[in-house]
Swiss-Prot record:
CDD domains attached to this UniProt entry: trimeric_dUTPase (cd07557)
Keyword Transmembrane helix: no
Positions contributing to dCTP binding: 99-104, 117, 125-127, 146, 159, 166, 170
GO molecular function: dCTP deaminase (dUMP-forming) activity; dCTP deaminase activity; nucleotide binding
This protein's record includes keyword Hydrolase: yes
Active-site residues per Swiss-Prot or TrEMBL entry: 127
GO-annotated biological processes: dUMP biosynthetic process; dUTP biosynthetic process
Annotated EC: 3.5.4.30
UniProt-recorded name of the protein: dCTP deaminase, dUMP-forming
């Protein structure tokens, strides 16, 4: 079941869903708007291959900054963070969606990582890309996306109890930690 405005507010007021900082005006009929944080990470353009199983190649030739505004250039991929830190109970999951007004500028908010598991605690890393033909300026604190909350049965092992919860507790834009996964290919 998707939570509606009063259910979102009720769960936040009772501490079942935690959002810091919380702004009641960001609650929408079926979602909670989230804002852009001020930490940004991107890969320096080049020919170096990124191997997801090799931590050094994942973390090499990366730039990052904290700023109140950032320009995303055509074709550029950038990681960012949400201003909000989220804490989900073991029976609520969330999905992140872009705001239509931002999408109409050519900004994709997430590539495929739009699912937030029950038990997750942390800021959300955004995988942004500009598919417009023109640069787009964005500001820390601007509403950029929305979280849709779903109730589920209680997870037997929520994300916060998993031994391999790679992104639990993250507080800034976080590079891929795929290299920490067990390797299944031959």
């Amino acid at each position: 079941m998707i939570l509606v405005d009063w259910q979102i507010m009720d769960r936040i007021s009772r501490g079942q869903i935690k959002v810091e900082p919380f702004e009641p005006g960001l609650i929408q009929p079926n979602s909670l708007d989230i804002r852009l944080g001020d930490h940004f990470v991107w890969y320096v353009p080049g020919d170096r291959v990124i191997d997801p199983y090799d931590k050094e190649s994942v973390t090499a030739e990366v730039e990052e900054m904290n700023a109140n505004e950032v320009i995303l250039y055509p074709g550029q991929f950038m990681l960012a963070e949400t201003k909000e830190v989220l804490s989900l109970p073991d029976n609520v999951v969330a999905s992140i969606e872009g705001k239509s007004s931002i999408a109409r500028l050519g900004i994709e908010l997430h590539q495929t990582g739009g699912w937030i598991d029950a038990g997750f605690i942390g800021s959300i890393t955004l995988e942004m890309c500009n598919v417009n033909q023109r640069p787009v300026k964005m500001y820390a604190g601007m509403p950029i996306g929305q979280l849709v909350f779903y109730t589920t049965e209680r997870a037997e092992q929520p994300y916060n109890l998993k031994q391999d919860a790679k992104y639990q507790g993250q507080r800034q834009a976080t590079l891929s930690r795929y290299h920490e996964n067990q390797r299944f290919i031959q």
